[in-house]
């Protein structure tokens, strides 16, 4: 059974209250734009307004059981839906989508990061040959690695790349939607980013993890185009992308907020199918 993420997209302000109750304010919930809840096993998440749950329940249960076949105005995606309901007195739009906690191959497991991973993250992320190639500075302490796990890797679009043989995270893999991407991409597109610890370079691990993430993004999330980029000084990353089906767009990109952002990056793209 799949986890389902529920996101409040917007609250439409109306002057007239919806007259469902004698005193609708007593039944209302405080719902803010961007607020999220996670539904486990198709159950109503704690803190979600009962009035909203009544409307979305059948959609959430269907998605949780892998029975969803919904099409909304934003994404051509059978694993998501956008619905409108109310929090007791005002209409609210919600986006509901399935979330994968784990993905795996014969030798790799992609799972959520844990704070207990901080020490091993630091072991690989403190290497000056790793971070700068991906646009971020080498970690300076275990505490810094712990903060990254809390504030960056806590996203539900980021996974630790774990070698099953050792049970140890050896890298990171994730995707960005059009709202969080470093580059300008379409609403139905995503951007993929990744890195692998230096001791595991040239073993096919990065290619294996990227193919797994591409399968998820194309066949579960149903993105139309998948984008990525790499520094011209890091051609090995480009070869990994080429093996996985990416093609060069003949465009160079610069991201000033990244470490080394003043250097050229090659932009690549993968079409669905």
Identify what each model region corresponds to.
Residues 2, 8-22:
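Short, structured beta-strand/loop micro-motifs enriched in basic residues and often containing a Trp
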Residues 19-44:
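Short, flexible N-terminal segments of the mature chain
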Residues 43, 137, 174-176:
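A generic structural motif
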Residues 44-54:
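Short, Lys/Arg- and Gly-enriched loop/turn segments at beta-strand edges
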Residues 59-99:
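Short, compact, well-ordered microdomains
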Residues 99-129, 162-273:
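Acyl-donor (CoA/ACP) binding surface of acyl/acetyltransferases
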Residues 129-150:
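Conserved GNAT-fold acetyl-CoA-binding loop/helix
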Residues 149-160:
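A short helix-loop-beta-strand connector motif used in the catalytic cores of GNAT acetyltransferases and
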């Amino acid at each position: 059974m799949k986890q389902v993420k529920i996101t409040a997209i917007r609250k439409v302000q109306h002057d007239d209250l919806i007259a469902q109750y004698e005193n609708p304010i007593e039944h209302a919930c405080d719902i803010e734009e961007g607020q999220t809840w996670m539904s486990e096993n198709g159950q109503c998440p704690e803190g979600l307004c009962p009035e909203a749950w009544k409307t979305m329940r059948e959609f959430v249960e269907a998605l949780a059981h892998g029975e969803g076949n919904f099409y909304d105005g934003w994404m051509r995606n059978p694993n998501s839906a956008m619905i409108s309901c109310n929090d007791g007195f005002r209409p609210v739009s919600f986006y509901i989508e399935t979330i994968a906690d784990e993905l795996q191959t014969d030798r790799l497991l992609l799972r959520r990061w844990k704070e207990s991973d901080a020490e091993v993250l630091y072991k690989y992320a403190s290497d000056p040959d790793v971070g700068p190639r991906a646009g971020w500075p080498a970690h300076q302490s275990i505490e810094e690695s712990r903060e990254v796990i809390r504030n960056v890797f806590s996203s539900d679009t980021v996974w630790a790349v774990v070698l099953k043989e050792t049970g140890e995270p050896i890298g990171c893999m994730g995707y960005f939607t059009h709202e969080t991407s470093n580059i300008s991409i379409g609403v139905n597109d995503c951007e993929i980013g990744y890195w692998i610890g230096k001791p595991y370079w040239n073993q096919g691990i990065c290619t294996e993890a990227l193919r797994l993430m591409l399968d998820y993004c194309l066949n579960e999330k149903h993105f139309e185009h998948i984008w990525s980029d790499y520094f011209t000084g890091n051609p090995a990353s480009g070869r990994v992308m080429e093996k996985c089906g990416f093609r060069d767009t003949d465009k160079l990109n610069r991201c000033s907020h990244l470490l080394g952002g003043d250097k050229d990056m090659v932009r690549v793209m993968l079409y669905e199918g």
